[in-house]
Swiss-Prot record:
Keyword Protein transport among UniProt keywords: yes
Main location: endoplasmic reticulum
Signal peptide per UniProt: none
Molecular function terms from GO: GTP binding; GTPase activity
Comment on protein domains: Switch 1, switch 2 and the interswitch regions are characteristic of Rab GTPases and mediate the interactions with Rab downstream effectors. The switch regions undergo conformational changes upon nucleotide binding which drive interaction with specific sets of effector proteins, with most effectors only binding to GTP-bound Rab.
GO biological process: brain development; chordate embryonic development; eye development; intracellular protein transport; lipid droplet organization
Name used for this protein in its record: Ras-related protein Rab-18-B
Catalyses which reaction(s): GTP + H2O = GDP + phosphate + H(+)
Annotated InterPro entries: P-loop_NTPase (IPR027417), Rab (IPR050227), Sigma_54_int_dom_ATP-bd_1 (IPR025662), Small_GTP-bd (IPR005225), Small_GTPase (IPR001806)
Amino acid sequence: MDDDVLTTLKILIIGESGVGKSSLLLRFTDDTFDPELAATIGVDFKVKTIAIDGNRAKLAIWDTAGQERFRTLTPSYYRGAQGVILVYDVTKRDTFTKLENWLNELETYCTRNDLVKMLVGNKIDKDNREVDRNEGLKFARKHSMLFIEASAKTRDGVQCAFEELVEKILQTPGLWESSIQNHGVQLSDNEPQRQGACGGYCSLV
């Protein structure tokens, strides 16, 4: 048992097939990138422990297939999640326009109203961009989401996306339970919020 782990959090990664959900997960957990990575079949699952403001949190990260034929997995996949990363491909506009569908699904199946949402525009290393950064930012603002652009290939923004999501979860009262007995939590409402490792890229809007 990890006695010094503050809490275990369930994080989901959702979005259309081919947007790079699995690549973002593997870059974050294993620091690897495979350009020939096959599409996820069903659900993949990885665990990683990170430190946020002196507190260690264990992340149980669920990566699901974007294809319609796997939608029967949906209810159990969403149950109990505290955070969700919603991914689109900045080079494919249709993956951006379908974000509303994913948000509707999230609202239908998620068991928490206060879960933290992060919008990630992936594949910014490519030249053929179809979705402007300001469009992503505007969408995130509309739906009260954190926002960042990233590249699983080059690492840009990946670590920040997960760290900022977890930090926001830990700052949300009642969203998580402490695994440490009688130790208290080293998070203070009086402390100024740090800008984050992304240097202003990532913001709650």
